[in-house]
């Protein structure tokens, strides 16, 4: 029996956007109500997705500037990044382009990304919205996905567990079934550009790199 394929999944994003809560929720099926560590301990377990078993390794990172020099050490060998921002924090949304994409493309230029908007429960809470109107919409999240060329965009809530499993199932699928980005040989003068069309469809409309 062959060994399960190992997939290293690294979560990145601003501090306090809920990366660690999301990981704890995914691995324990419950929302942490007491102490929440700054960084989640590395986790590894066999996971079944679409009938295929993989060994999923989860790596958490601290988003604060104090860890900027150490954080890239976690990127080595990564198969997929889960890049998170908070749906109730415009600053964390803007930092995806300002901070995180430059960092990821510098240290891991060819690793695919799943973009995740966290704290969905608060964005959908009418009581919360009464005092906080500067939230990120689904349309804005999808626009950002296209801008950075992420393979997928998912909104989730660790508190209600909505879509948390979908985040990591999607990350696994992206690694197992990467978008086709083969270029048509240039020696053929009458090529049909079919490679670009396929990549766009598989990626859900994103532009192939």
Curated annotation (Swiss-Prot):
Mention one GO molecular function. Answer: GTP binding
Per UniProt, which keywords does this protein have? Abscisic acid signaling pathway, GTP-binding, Lipoprotein, Membrane, Nucleotide-binding, Palmitate
What InterPro entries is this protein classified in? P-loop_NTPase, Small_GTP-bd, Small_GTPase, Small_GTPase_Rho
* Highest taxon, organism lineage: Eukaryota
Q: Does the keyword Nucleotide-binding apply?
A: yes
Where does this one sit in the cell?
Answer: Membrane
Q: What does this protein do?
A: Acts as a negative regulator of abscisic acid (ABA) responses.
Question: What name goes with this protein?
Answer: Rac-like GTP-binding protein ARAC7
- The gene for this chain is ARAC7
């Amino acid at each position: 029996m062959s060994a399960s394929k190992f997939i290293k999944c690294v979560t990145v994003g601003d501090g306090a956007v809920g990366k660690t809560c999301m990981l704890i929720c995914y691995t324990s099926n419950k929302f942490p109500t007491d102490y929440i560590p700054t960084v989640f301990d590395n986790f590894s377990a066999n996971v079944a997705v679409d009938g295929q078993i993989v060994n999923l390794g989860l790596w958490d990172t601290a988003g604060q500037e104090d860890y900027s020099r150490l954080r890239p050490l976690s990127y080595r060998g990564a198969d997929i990044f889960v890049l998170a921002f908070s749906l109730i924090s415009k600053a964390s949304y803007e930092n995806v382009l300002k901070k995180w994409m430059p960092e990821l493309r510098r240290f891991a230029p060819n690793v695919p990304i799943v973009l995740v908007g966290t704290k969905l429960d608060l964005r959908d809470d009418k009581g919360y919205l009464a005092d906080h109107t500067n939230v990120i919409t689904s349309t804005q999240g999808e626009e950002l996905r296209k801008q950075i060329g992420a393979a997928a965009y998912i909104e989730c809530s660790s508190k209600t567990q909505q879509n948390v499993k979908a985040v990591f199932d999607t990350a696994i699928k992206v690694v197992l079934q990467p978008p086709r980005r083969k270029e048509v040989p240039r020696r053929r003068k009458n090529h049909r550009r079919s490679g670009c069309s396929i990549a766009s469809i598989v990626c859900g409309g994103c532009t192939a790199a």
